[in-house]
Amino acid sequence: GCMLEAGALANSQRYAASLPPLGTGIILAVLTAVVLFGGAKRIGWTASVLVPVSAGLYLLAGGIVVFSFYDQIPEVLGKIVGGAFGLADNAGQTAGSSILNFSGISGGMTGYGMAAAIRSGVSRGVFSNEAGLGSLAVLHGMSEGKGRLRQRQEAQKQGMWAIFEVFFDTIIGCSLTAFLLLCVFPHNLTEKIDSLGGSGAVAAALAARFGNAGGIVTAACMVLFAFATILAWFYIGDQALGWLMRDVPQKRADKICILYHGGYLASVFLGCVSRMEAVWAVSDIFNGLMAVPNLAALVLLGRKVRRPER
């Protein structure tokens, strides 16, 4: 998680501020270390400040750009729906195959396109909203109520917030990004992403409406979003490591924690300077490994989750 966030941040800074990834990696690793060694309270406070500011700023700027292209919204919506079912890229080929009566080939191409779209959409969606991974439970567990009844009420409240976060992140945030890019770059979006990267393309889209200020807005949002997420992933890993070492002698546990801290900071730096394709591939594998045991646990604990509501 932290490597992808660091890579996206470095990409946006390279476009907006002409800052090389090496420099971004050093600065980001140092800032991360300053917050991490302040403990869980500093991590929670920093994230609680950064996330609302960055989300509000991005929604405002992106919404202005999208509504300035209001006449293109129906066409963009059609592209999104077609792409979701793998129809957009293969439309011309499918039509040609139908004329030649190659219905089997046409169906196979369409099926492959749908499968590829679903695989890509699920993997990117899971990385974005972390639905089904079990990671958000660790973060929401930081909120505690006094007394048994208050603890139960707080747990239910945090569960509802977790559901809302998935909706907000995917339906609102990701949809806004899709409309933003497709409205501004209706014909050359692939080339823009290949040359600038994902966050660089978003910066270019905002710059098309706001000029240099658009790039600054994107850079600021990416810094706030990515930094808050990097801190959150550290806390998740730290809590998991603490549980695994609950029976380990304290001195040995302290040494392992130091190694974890150093390895995490190194991962933040490497994320800024690594090829994103390789990082995405590794992240997809580990997300799958996280989802399997968590989804199995959700099925087994389903009755206990429903029981307090009866």
Can you describe what each PLM-predicted range is?
Residues G25, G145-F168, V248-L259:
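Membrane-interface alpha-helices at helix entry/exit sites of multi-pass transporters
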